[in-house]
């Protein structure tokens, strides 16, 4: 049972609770946390804490990682940052974490990508605009910086709603808040 104001934000398939793998989490405020997957091997009936959140913060993305890839964070204002996963040290379950990206006042993180391949990144805005960018165009920088502009946000484009890593063969399904689905090939963006 969940608390009154609590909801499920992520589901992860786990075969083995290995010490060589990690749970990497990011919150809307840009906080990142990396915890050994083995720390989650003994859950309690009432659940266990995965990350300690501040009042106005929420969990945005969770991935299982090998600890050796690059991390990309994308914000609603079109900013992004790429840094080494090794820049975030592994901490216990109840820790808050560290700053992944420095955000402007009303900006928030909307996507987490663990770059396990060199495939391009597709960024989409709330008004249906998208941009496909080669991964190597996102330069690696120190964790906690302001990042770079990934896509321009404007009245025409709207805010960024998400970013995903795609291949030329991928097809995407974009679904509006009214339930309308648009299908597009990644290579056409």
Predicted feature locations:
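Short, structured "edge-of-domain" segments at secondary-structure transitions
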Residues: 1-189
């Amino acid at each position: 049972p969940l608390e009154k104001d609590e909801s499920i934000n992520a589901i992860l398939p786990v075969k083995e609770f290995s010490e060589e793998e990690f749970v990497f989490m990011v919150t809307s405020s840009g906080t990142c946390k990396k915890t050994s997957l083995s720390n989650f091997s003994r859950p309690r009936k009432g659940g266990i804490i995965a990350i300690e959140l501040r009042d106005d913060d929420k969990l945005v993305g969770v991935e299982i990682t090998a600890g050796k890839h690059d991390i990309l964070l994308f914000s609603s204002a079109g900013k992004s940052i790429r840094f080494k996963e090794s820049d975030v040290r592994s901490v216990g379950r109840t820790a808050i974490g560290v700053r992944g990206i420095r955000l402007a006042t009303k900006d928030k993180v909307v996507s987490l990508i663990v770059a396990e391949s060199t495939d391009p990144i597709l960024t989409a805005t709330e008004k249906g605009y998208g941009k496909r960018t080669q991964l190597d165009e996102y330069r690696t920088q120190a964790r906690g910086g302001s990042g770079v502009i990934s896509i321009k946000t404007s009245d025409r484009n709207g805010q960024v709603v998400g970013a995903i890593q795609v291949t030329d063969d991928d097809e995407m399904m974009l679904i509006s808040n009214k339930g309308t689905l648009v299908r597009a090939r990644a290579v056409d963006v």
